């Protein structure tokens, strides 16, 4: 519930309340109490009574106020989060922002509420990158808010576009385009729109992935049908070869410390996961159980990986601690693919 002070349009408070409610419902972790079910409508701590929420089975309650700051349209939004079971206020804050950015302010508040309750960073102000193929001859590289709003078209082509990957600072996107007849990797600056092509010698260049420190891209370069893993330095624009094997090496993914890469290779006769140190180029096989292990990714702590695990025609999402040889399957279905993890 967000109240308003005199001189402020009432719909600002309503919009913030609705935006926060929508955000908190986005991932299915929370349920909201409708306004019609509430026993009271507090806009300050002095009006807040824990009993009114406890009897309704509410765990947390958020209240706030919207105040006008100046004639330029700036607003001061204050908010408080209460833990009903513990009967204490666990979060409060203020944000000054433009009335034209109510939605953005609501996302910041939602992030703080989410982190206070769950201990995880909120991701409501993050963005999506994706490719739209609206008809047979048009491909568009797009970005939008996490809820699909505020879509922007970055690039349009008559040829296929694929594999977008964000830079860590969210200022650039790397992707693959076939606009010149072959698979080619481009890096596009989101602010200026400028595009740089990675000049690799291979016939096919694919699977670009930014390192967490933003200094390099891991990518796959294919010479005469033999894909290998390469590093591309953002600073000096040089390519360094990491793998050199007659088997297929593909699907690179970085460790959180930017020192290692996990990749898929069929060098053993079936797709399995390997890890390589980007400095020493030492390689280590990570998976042995099952006849198919691919699409590996590190957990944020770097101690475990998750991937697609296949055995006897069933493909499931699995996890494995790097310190252990055992695999734990997370899903019970048979055609699972392409796991990824949220920014938090």
List where the protein language model places each region:
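Amphipathic beta-strand/beta-sheet edge segments enriched in Tyr/Trp
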Residues: 45-112
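A short beta-strand motif characteristic of beta-propeller blades
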Residues: 150-155, 194-199, 238-243, 282-287, ...
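Residue-level detector of Asp-centered blade-edge/turn motifs that repeat once per structural unit
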Residues: 122-124, 168-169, 212-213, 256-257, ...
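Short loop/turn segments that connect beta-strands within beta-propeller blades
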Residues: 85, 145-149, 189-193, 233-237, ...
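A flexible loop/linker signature enriched in serine peptidases of the S9 family
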Residues: 121, 132-140, 157-159, 176-184, ...
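Hydrophobic beta-strand positions that form the internal "hydrophobic ladder"
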Residues: 128, 170-174, 214-218, 261-262, ...
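Short beta-strand->alpha-helix linker/helix-N-cap micro-motif
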Residues: 1-51, 62-66
């Amino acid at each position: 519930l967000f109240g308003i002070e005199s001189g402020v349009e009432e719909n600002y408070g309503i919009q913030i309340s609705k935006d926060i409610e929508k955000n908190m419902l986005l991932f299915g972790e929370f349920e909201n109490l409708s306004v019609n079910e509430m026993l009271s409508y507090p806009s300050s701590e002095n009006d807040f009574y824990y009993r009114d929420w406890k009897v309704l089975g509410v765990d947390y309650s958020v209240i706030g106020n919207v105040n006008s700051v100046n004639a330029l349209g700036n607003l001061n939004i204050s908010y408080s989060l209460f833990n009903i079971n513990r009967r204490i206020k666990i979060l409060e804050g203020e944000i000054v922002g433009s009335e034209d950015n109510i939605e953005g302010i609501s996302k910041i508040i939602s992030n703080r509420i989410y982190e206070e309750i769950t201990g995880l960073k909120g991701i409501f102000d993050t963005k999506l990158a994706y490719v739209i193929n609206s008809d047979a001859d048009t491909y568009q590289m797009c970005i939008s808010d996490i809820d699909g709003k505020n879509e922007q078209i970055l690039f349009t082509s008559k040829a296929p576009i694929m594999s977008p990957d964000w830079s860590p600072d969210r200022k650039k996107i790397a992707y693959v385009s076939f606009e010149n007849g072959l698979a080619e990797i481009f890096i596009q600056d989101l602010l200026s729109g400028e595009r740089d092509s990675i000049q690799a010698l291979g016939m096919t260049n694919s699977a670009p992935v930014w390192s967490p420190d933003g200094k390099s891209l891991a990518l796959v370069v294919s010479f005469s049908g033999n894909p290998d893993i390469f590093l591309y330095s953002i600073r000096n624009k040089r390519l360094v070869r990491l793998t050199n094997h007659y088997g297929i090496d593909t699907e690179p993914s970085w460790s959180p410390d930017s020192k290692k890469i996990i990749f898929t290779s069929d060098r053993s006769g079936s797709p399995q996961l390997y890890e390589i140190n980007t400095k020493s180029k030492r390689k280590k096989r990570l998976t042995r159980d099952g006849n198919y292990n691919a699409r590996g990714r590190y957990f944020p702590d770097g101690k475990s990986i998750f991937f697609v695990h296949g055995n006897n025609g069933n493909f499931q999402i699995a996890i494995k601690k790097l310190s252990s040889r055992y695999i734990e399957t997370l899903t019970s279905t048979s055609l699972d693919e392409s796991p990824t993890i949220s920014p938090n």
